[in-house]
Amino acid sequence: KIDSSLIDEKVETSFDLLKETVSVTSAARMKAKLKRRWPLNQALICVNKGEKEVLESLSELVKSQMNVQNYEIIEIGNSEGMEQYLELKQRGLPVVPKIELERSAIGPKAKQDMGKLLKMFSETDPESIIDELKKKDSYTFQIGENSVTLDKEDFVVDFEVNERYQFAKRQNLIVIISLERDDEMMAKGLIKDLARRIQTLRKEKGYNPTDILEKASILELDQDSFNLIKDKTEDIAFLVRVKKVDFIESCENYKEDDIDGLKVKIAVE
């Protein structure tokens, strides 16, 4: 006999992880100034060992909740520091190292050369420091006659992503999103959102679902959104069963609506 409480627990774990992933994705979107309604081209999701299968069991929900076309789930074992950066890099993720000095620890080692050390550190390629730390757990700066050797613990190593991506992380859950903009995909997403709201308005007004109405009108789109869909009025008309769609004040009564922060007015008659 299958224990149903175990099944429930598994489902609950999957949904908890999905919720957390969507939350981290939202944080990455905010950093990138990408609104929830814009579909993402690609997302790379890093999870703990054993969690890939858990998240993949909700594959379609992952896509719809994150509003992403393609995603890849990567299991990682390291949750911080140089080890995490090296693992992400080794897995082919678009990461770049971010290194700072542990100021309190290096004072006694740098002594009077502190200013020069900081300058030299800022001019040194982070990758070369990491390569050296990997080999011998220390890095030596040659400052004139003096050499200052810093241990691995004297560096704070983290990662960032290259300019084509943005990311957010919470412990070992990392979501990296592509900033590549696909206008066709974005237009489709906006049309779908508008059509859904216009169909709801049709229902509210009591129109028969099979009737072809005269027109639908959409006002107050921002310039970006208008540019995406201005040439796609036939697609919208087909979806909402009207003869034509316009973007001018041509109807009697408009309803105010909101699409993920985009305030619009819609009408149908």
Where are these regions (language model features)?
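Feature 926 captures the class I aminoacyl-tRNA synthetase adenylation module centered on the KMSKS loop
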Residues: 1-269
